[in-house]
């Protein structure tokens, strides 16, 4: 079993059109990877977690790469690809 080296966390909430847009970009980027199994994607809702709600309520969607904020509001596909490539290089070194 391959353990994903890079963790993506998409924080949003239901009914958020920017969250839907972000999910679509992330899904497209992951589908285009040579090794999509090397990246895991977890989606969290601020409605289910008071801590996330307090921290991110006015910034969703928020995309984390390995626990660090990568972007808020809009996900840029090219920037995400570069971040994933960097995360992979960092894991390999």
Give short role names for the model-derived ranges.
Residues 61-69:
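A short, hydrophobic beta-strand/beta-hairpin element that forms part of a small beta-sheet core
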Residues 18, 27, 69-75:
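A structural signal for the main folded, soluble domain(s) of proteins
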Residues 30-36, 88-91:
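Alpha-helix termini
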Residues 36-50:
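Thiol-based oxidoreductase modules, predominantly thioredoxin-like and allied folds used
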Residues 5, 82, 86-93:
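Short, charged, intrinsically disordered terminal tails
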Residues 2-32:
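Local sequence-structure signature of Cys/Sec-based thiol-disulfide redox active-site neighborhoods
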């Amino acid at each position: 079993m391959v353990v994903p080296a890079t963790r993506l966390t998409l924080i949003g909430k239901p009914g958020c059109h920017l969250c839907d847009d972000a999910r679509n970009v992330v899904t497209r980027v992951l589908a285009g990877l040579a090794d999509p199994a090397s990246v895991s994607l977890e989606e969290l809702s601020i409605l289910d977690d008071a801590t996330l709600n307090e921290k991110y309520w006015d910034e969703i969607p928020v995309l984390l790469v390995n626990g660090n904020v990568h972007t808020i509001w809009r996900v840029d596909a090219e920037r995400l690809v570069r971040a994933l490539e960097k995360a992979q290089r960092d894991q390999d070194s």
